[in-house]
Amino acid sequence: MIIDVNIPIPFRLDKYLKRLYPLLTQGVIEKALRQKQITVNFQKAEANLRVKVGDTIFINDYFNLPVTQHETLVFADAEIKLAKKILTDYLIYEDDHLIAINKPASLATQGGSKINLSIDSALKYLNYQGADFKLVHRLDKETSGLLLIAKNYLSSVKLHNAFKEKLVIKKYFAITYGRPVKNVGTVKSNIGKSKRRLSKIANIDSDDGKLAITYYKLLKSLNNNLFLIEFMPVTGRMHQLRLHAQLLGCPILGDDKYGNKEIMPYSKYMFLHANNIYLSETIVGKEIKLEAKLPFYFTRRII
C-alpha cells in the first residue's frame, strides 16, 4: 500500500499512522518500522520522523493493517482556504509549542449557532490532515490581533494553565469615543451574564459576577473626540475590555453592543486590537515576545 502524505505541516510518522488507523498500537508501529514493513520514501524510518507534503509512506502488502480507518469528514472550501491562510497569511510566529496568528476582525474564533466559519473549524480540517492544533484562548469575533494556538496536547495544557494563572501578559490598542477622567488607571468590576438579555454581558457588582481587572493608559488624542488607549487585562472575562471602556465613559469605536449608537460616529469595524503578548521562559521553556500589526483601517485613524 502507498500513502501520499498531504498534511500541510510536518507531523510525526507514528501519530500520522494512528490517525489513519486508530487501532494501530505504538508497539505494532515501532515493530513494523524496525522490520521495514513500513518505510518512508523507500528508507527505513523512526517513529518520531516528521513526514510532510511530498513524502510517501510504503506499507508492505503482507502487513496486517486494522480494517477500520478514521471516519471520512467533509470540509467546506472556505474552511480549507482559511486553514491555508492560518499557516501563511495570518501566521506571525511558530515554534515546536505553538503558532501565533494575526486574526482579522469579523472572523470568529469558535463556531456557534449562526457561525459557519471560524478559526476552530479550520483547525479541525488541519487536525484531520494530521496536525494536533488546540485553541488555548479566544478573541471576540469583532476583535483583531494576536491569537495563540497550541501545536500539541502538552503545550495546550501549559498555555491554558498560564492564561488561567494570569501569567500571560496581553496588551490591546483601542480607539474610544471620549476619554477617561484619568490618563492612567485601573478598572475593577464584577462581570456576569445579563439577566435580561442572555446574549449580552453586563457589569454587575454582585455575587453572580466574577472579578475583572484592567489596567489602562491614554496614549494619544485623535480627531473628533476619539482617543487611542492601551488596555492591559489582568483577568480574561467575556467582553471585559469593551465593558471596562464603557465603564470609563469612553466606549470603543464601532462597538455596537456596548457603545452609544446615538452619539458615536458610525464605523464598519470595531477598533479593538490584541497588539502584544508576552510569555515568560517558565511557560514553554523560552521567553516569547509577540506583536501583531495593526489592520489598515486602524492605522489610518491614528496617523
From Swiss-Prot:
The keyword Metal-binding does not apply. Gene3D superfamilies: Pseudouridine synthase, RNA-binding S4 domain. It comes from the Bacteria. It is an enzyme of class 5 (isomerase). Signal peptide: none annotated. Belongs to the pseudouridine synthase RluA family. This is Ribosomal large subunit pseudouridine synthase C. The gene is rluC.
